[in-house]
């Protein structure tokens, strides 16, 4: 929510895939006072928490939390989104979390990167942006799926624990279609090199 670059004037509809408790959707609602934000998650308990959080916020009238599988989701009015954000599942099949609800929400078999890009393309307007966070080990796969889906990289931030260490996560922002400029790449250390 805080990292994704969104144009307040051009962004009227935003979709948060895998909204969980709704934190990213709430951050976007705060940043984009003219936008409607839809959070979607497959886990009913997460959606209930997101609905409670949205209702307690000053942005409640612009937030909608939906319990659905993005693979089958259709916006009520059929209108495409201007921006999509996602913190997608990141566990591989070999490393399932013990809790079943967390497994459903975080398991890559439930929503592969290929499927994520197919549905982002289906739900996003041409020229719209798609921002997501992925494990660094998945970068090549994600960039490949993005290219196959007609997305172009706009921005990449490698998240490292300390300067000089290999990245743990990658923050990526794509545009559906051709990018107006060369992608901006940077690094975000979580701690100073000497700390």
Regions found by a protein language model. Name each.
Residues 51-76:
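S-adenosyl-L-methionine
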Residues 21-33:
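Conserved SAM-binding loop of SAM-dependent methyltransferases across substrates and taxa
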Residues 164-195:
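SAM/dcSAM-binding transferase cores
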Residues 75-83:
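A short acidic, Gly/Pro-enriched loop at the edge of an enzyme's catalytic core
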Residues 88-115, 119:
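Mobile active-site "lid"/loop adjacent to the S-adenosyl-L-methionine
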Residues 111-167, 171:
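Conserved Class I SAM-dependent methyltransferase catalytic core
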Residues 11-18:
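Conserved class I S-adenosyl-L-methionine
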Residues 36-41:
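Conserved SAM-binding motif I beta-strand of class I
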